[in-house]
Amino acid sequence: MGSFKDDREEVLQAWYMDDSDEDQRLPHHRDPKEFVSLDQLAKLGVLSWRLDADNYETDEELKKIREARGYSYMDFCEVCPEKLPNYEEKIKNFFEEHLHTDEEIRYCVAGSGYFDVRDQNDSWIRVWLKKGGMIVLPAGIYHRFTLDSNNYIKAMRLFVGDPVWTPFNRPHDNLPARQEYLEAFGQKEAANHVVDAAA
């Protein structure tokens, strides 16, 4: 008997990033590679599911998640040079480290891309989201997004109520959403970075 494998890992993988300034669309693995489990992501408040991307219109699992979490709003966003107006500018904006005062929910129905999130020690974790993967980033987590080398993702965006996509670029540690995130997920270390820099 083989060991139990989480089927989410086929559409969601995560690892610690290196510090290289090379093309942001490359994997940026450390050497040796340091993978991060989906359970570790959950401890940062990052939730994930594997869903049937070919049948999202009739998927009962998606319907249950939306009802349970109150995701009343839905639309789609295609990110690629041909489909996104002001592509270069948008991609730069997506890759600026920022937070939101609400959850960011993305369900990849085609293509793939990277969501980078900060861990408790302010290190970057790269989350590779592929077709069928759905991810929820909690309000208040510092993160950023980029395409991978395939240069294409089509994602369903979900939201509770009317959508607000306002990014607050780092630093915005004074926002209640950030304070609540730190309290919920124990990121006390992040506050010490300011002290370290001044020492």
Swiss-Prot record:
Cofactor requirement: Fe(2+); Ni(2+)
Pathway per the UniProt entry: Amino-acid biosynthesis; L-methionine biosynthesis via salvage pathway; L-methionine from S-methyl-5-thio-alpha-D-ribose 1-phosphate: step 5/6
Catalysis performed (reactions): 1,2-dihydroxy-5-(methylsulfanyl)pent-1-en-3-one + O2 = 4-methylsulfanyl-2-oxobutanoate + formate + 2 H(+); 1,2-dihydroxy-5-(methylsulfanyl)pent-1-en-3-one + O2 = 3-(methylsulfanyl)propanoate + CO + formate + 2 H(+)
Protein keywords: Amino-acid biosynthesis, Cytoplasm, Dioxygenase, Iron, Metal-binding, Methionine biosynthesis, Nickel, Nucleus, Oxidoreductase
Species name: Vitis vinifera
Molecular function terms, GO-annotated: acireductone dioxygenase (Ni2+-requiring) activity; acireductone dioxygenase [iron(II)-requiring] activity; iron ion binding; nickel cation binding
Stated role: Catalyzes 2 different reactions between oxygen and the acireductone 1,2-dihydroxy-3-keto-5-methylthiopentene (DHK-MTPene) depending upon the metal bound in the active site. Fe-containing acireductone dioxygenase (Fe-ARD) produces formate and 2-keto-4-methylthiobutyrate (KMTB), the alpha-ketoacid precursor of methionine in the methionine recycle pathway. Ni-containing acireductone dioxygenase (Ni-ARD) produces methylthiopropionate, carbon monoxide and formate, and does not lie on the methionine recycle pathway.
Pfam families registered for this protein in UniProt: ARD (PF03079)
Alphabetized PANTHER family for the sequence: ACIREDUCTONE DIOXYGENASE (PTHR23418:SF0)
InterPro entries listed in its UniProt record: ARD, ARD_euk, RmlC-like_jellyroll, RmlC_Cupin_sf
Descriptive protein name: Acireductone dioxygenase 2
Residues binding Fe(2+): 98, 100, 104, 143
Family: Belongs to the acireductone dioxygenase (ARD) family.
GO BP: L-methionine salvage from methylthioadenosine; methionine metabolic process
Subcellular location: Cytoplasm; Nucleus
One GO cellular component, as annotated: cytoplasm
This enzyme's EC code(s): 1.13.11.54, 1.13.11.53
Binding site for Ni(2+): 98, 100, 104, 143
Cofactor note: Binds either 1 Fe or Ni cation per monomer. Iron-binding promotes an acireductone dioxygenase reaction producing 2-keto-4-methylthiobutyrate, while nickel-binding promotes an acireductone dioxygenase reaction producing 3-(methylsulfanyl)propanoate.
HAMAP family: Salvage_MtnD_euk (MF_03154)
